[in-house]
């Protein structure tokens, strides 16, 4: 892209699955926004871009997000995330849809079912102990329990949890005032 136009292209990463979107809120206030860790990573990256893009010849007041499929969906979710307001100004959604995200009680029930299974698989007594488990071991445990937990309808994907961090599915709650100003 930058070869063919006067643009600075930055790619960002974020946590996915149980590291990025597992709702641990039923286990305490400290986990209130655990189901939004992946989106929080993207907001942190956008803050860094806003503060540093000029050093690379970019304009912090002219940032366009783009994504394909799940990445396109992330553009929509960031439009509903107040912490991202003003950090990007346009969006390109390539084959990404506004999906009806799991929220509220369903997300809590999913999180509780998955965590209960993980704790049993890892022979742990407390959700706090999950924070000390190496990623490879945690992922292996999740892969082992996920098929059985999925039979109950519980699922962790790449969607944020609707709360005060992410305001929710715009098809249900409407777009935020800021989102209405972003050309897509």
Feature roles, as predicted:
Residues 1-43, 47, 51-55:
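Cap/lid segment of the alpha/beta-hydrolase catalytic domain
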Residues 4-10, 59-63, 84-90, 180-184:
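Loop/turn elements at helix/coil->beta-strand transitions in domains of secreted/extracellular proteins
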Residues 14, 68, 90-102:
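Active-site nucleophile loop of the alpha/beta-hydrolase fold
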Residues 20-24, 76-78, 101-106:
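Short, solvent-exposed loop/turn and secondary-structure capping segments
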Residues 49, 56-69:
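Alpha/beta-hydrolase fold nucleophile elbow
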Residues 58-61, 73-75, 88, 124-127:
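Short secondary-structure junction motifs
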Residues 72-84:
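Short glycine-enriched nucleophile-adjacent loop
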Residues 85, 94-184:
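Substrate-access "cap/lid" subdomains that shape
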């Amino acid at each position: 892209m930058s070869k063919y136009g006067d643009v600075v292209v930055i790619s960002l990463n974020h946590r996915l699955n149980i590291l990025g979107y597992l709702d641990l809120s039923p286990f305490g206030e400290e986990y209130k926004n655990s189901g939004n860790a992946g989106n929080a990573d993207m907001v942190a990256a956008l803050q860094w871009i806003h503060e540093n893009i000029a050093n690379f010849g970019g304009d912090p007041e002219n940032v366009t997000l783009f994504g394909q499929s799940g990445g396109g969906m992330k553009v929509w979710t960031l439009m509903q995330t107040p912490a991202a307001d003003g950090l990007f100004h346009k969006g390109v959604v390539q084959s990404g849809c506004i999906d009806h995200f799991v929220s509220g009680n369903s997300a809590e029930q999913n999180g509780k079912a998955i965590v209960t299974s993980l704790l049993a698989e890892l022979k742990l007594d407390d959700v706090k102990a999950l924070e000390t488990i190496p990623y490879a071991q945690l992922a292996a445990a999740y892969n082992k329990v996920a098929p059985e937990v999925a039979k109950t309808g519980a699922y962790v994907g790449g969607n944020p949890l609707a709360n005060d961090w992410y305001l929710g599915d715009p098809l249900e709650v409407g777009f935020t005032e800021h989102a209405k100003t972003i050309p897509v």
